[in-house]
Amino acid sequence: MAQPFDLGKPNRTIRVGVILMGGRTEALDVAPVDMIHSITKGFVDELPAEWLPMNIRSQAIEAEFLWVSEAGKCSTSKLTSAMSIVTTHSFDDCPPLDVVMIGAHNFSYQPTEKELAFVRKSWESCSAFLAICGGIEVAVLAGIVGSKTATAPRFALESLRQRVPEATWVNKRWERDGKLWTSGTLLNGLDATSAFIQETWGKGEGSLVDYTMKLCAWPIRDGEYGDVSWSF
């Protein structure tokens, strides 16, 4: 049996894939993928030499980014705010993904069985699966949540507790259970992705991740919503 791919000590280029459903995907849900890009050689190598010491620069990872839909290469997938993105791969020609990110689709869209089958296939092969905001709905429909601990948009938690009672649903900005990472609504995906990156590629003084968090002003917020007074 093949050993799981070690994202923290990769021996090849990491494949980061955003899986897009056929409806409209929330742009802010999938935007956090760019946080991963900010610690790659492709990004770091373009920074001015005086900005980044060589010992930190050398920590950058090699990664390629794949945008995957059922229709595939050269087709466009819709995002919110009248945006669209040209996908790079179809379900048929996409290589196994190491990191998967899925955001919410519009409420009126129902994922196809082919879409859900590809999500399940990607779940089996990946080392990390990030369901951002309503992307948890795709994970639920694909049957990969099971009895895991997960979070979701706060307004959806009670409904999910009723629909998927075998799972443990927590009221948090983000949650991790093994390779499944889930987040609250929209911008909580930034918190989830930040936590994933810190856990996977290191943190603390002298690390590229710590430097990038400061350079790019990544949010640092209470994971249990302790910094806000409102609730659902």
Sequence positions of predicted segments:
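Extended, subdomain-level signal for the structured scaffold at the beginning of enzyme domains
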Residues: 1-129, 137-141, 158, 163, ...
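A short beta-strand/loop micro-motif in the catalytic core of glycosyltransferases
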Residues: 129-130, 150
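Aromatic-residue-lined binding/catalytic grooves and analogous aromatic/hydrophobic interfacial grooves
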Residues: 133
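Rossmann-fold dinucleotide-binding core
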Residues: 145-154, 159-183
